[in-house]
Amino acid sequence: MVRLEKNDPLMLARQLPLKTVALILAGGRGTRLKDLTIKRAKPAVHFGGKFRIIDFALSNCLNSGIRRIGVITQYQSHTLVQHIQRGWSFFSEEMNEFVDLLPAQQRVHGENWYRGTADAVTQNLDIIRRYGAEYIVILAGDHIYKQDYSHMLIDHVEKGARCTVACLPVPVAEAAAFGVMDVDENDLIIDFVEKPANPPTMPSDPTKSLASMGIYIFDAEYLYDLLEEDDKDENSSHDFGKDIIPKITKAGMAYAHPFPLSCVQSDPTAEPYWRDVGTLEAYWKANLDLASVTPELDMYDQNWPIRTHMESLPPAKFVQDRSGSHGMTLNSLVSGGCIISGSVVVQSVLFPRVRINSFCNIDSSVLLPDVWIGRSCRLRRCVIDRACIIPEGMVIGENAEEDARRFYRSEEGIVLVTREMLRKLQIKQER
């Protein structure tokens, strides 16, 4: 048993994570990302040149001192499981450290898979209890942010809360996609509504609503009792946002934790960074922001590194083609194993092993691993899925009608290209 030094914040920051287990909900399909998630769960989607989305929640746990982690999986989990096995298998069993994969197995309710976010935890309660944690951190595996959970744990303990919900002001126009809360002067949550049609505004700012980030801390035994009670409720949807948090709020046991208090950022004057990259435009925009001169998310902070599975790849190469054209980039991220031959890449993100042949112009695009671009192509405002082969002379992103006919084009004009779409155009996808 770790004795808490409640008067010493530094000691609390070290001690509380040792008494904590993090559960990452990573079974979501992410339908708003369209064909990007047909063959992979949203947390397994590539992001930022070399990472997967789930790497951010996992890295936050590691950097916060939480080294007992359960990852709850369901939809199209193979890619996600493989990534975690390859990139996150360094924890020490002798030190009681682990990343435990918890797939849906129909273990509790016969033919039912996970019926909701809360049920995903309920169906694994027998395993989770054996972890012997005093605190449980519930995390979404599909958000991009940097947060020190030890600071949120301190806030939870000092307030005497049974449940703490991380929150962030969002524009009212966007609030309908979140759980929205109202709090008193002590951060006690006095009202909570999940995805309201008419979101209530913050008294201090009528243009904003106070939104739940889907990050929760519970006293462990309190959570177990709640979930067992919820499991027996036939009228429940077994979801944290729809059922559990509103119930705790009515009991006066839930507190809010302002995200700026635990957000990790290099520039303390900057706006706290948190993104739900759940739509194609949000995903494209968040990736391209990383390639800007001063990105909102600092990926180069050595004090808070983002880990991932590291392949052994040669350096990126920019070469002159036989005609004398130079391969060059501007304001772009280019990962290992990429070769740019006699082409220009501007404000784009290239994942590992991308090959761009001569006379191409790539602008404001995201190219996932193993993409091959033939000669004389022009790509603008695109997301090209893994291992796509773009044939010589293809133009994408310049003709809205043509893009919508061949590929998926969002309302904002972002074009998604997949191997299946190219095959339907009779374009061979094997080299």
Swiss-Prot record:
Annotated disulfide bonds: none
Family assignment from sequence similarity: Belongs to the bacterial/plant glucose-1-phosphate adenylyltransferase family.
Protein's name according to its UniProt entry: Glucose-1-phosphate adenylyltransferase
Gene3D superfamilies cross-referenced by the UniProt entry: Hexapeptide repeat proteins, Spore Coat Polysaccharide Biosynthesis Protein SpsA, Chain A
Residue numbers marked as site, Could play a key role in the communication between the regulatory and the substrate sites: 74, 113
Binding-site positions, AMP: 40, 46, 52, 130, 386
Known role: Involved in the biosynthesis of ADP-glucose, a building block required for the elongation reactions to produce glycogen. Catalyzes the reaction between ATP and alpha-D-glucose 1-phosphate (G1P) to produce pyrophosphate and ADP-Glc.
Record CDD domains: ADP_Glucose_PP, LbH_G1P_AT_C
Positions bound to beta-D-fructose 1,6-bisphosphate: 39, 419-423, 429-431
Catalytic activity: alpha-D-glucose 1-phosphate + ATP + H(+) = ADP-alpha-D-glucose + diphosphate
Means of activity regulation: Allosterically activated by fructose-1,6-bisphosphate (F16BP) and inhibited by AMP.
GO biological process, one term: glycogen biosynthetic process
GO molecular function, one term: ATP binding
Keyword Nucleotidyltransferase: yes
Oligomer status and interactors: Homotetramer.
This enzyme's EC code(s): 2.7.7.27
Top EC class, one word: transferase
Pathway where this protein functions: Glycan biosynthesis; glycogen biosynthesis
Species of origin: Enterobacter sp. (strain 638)
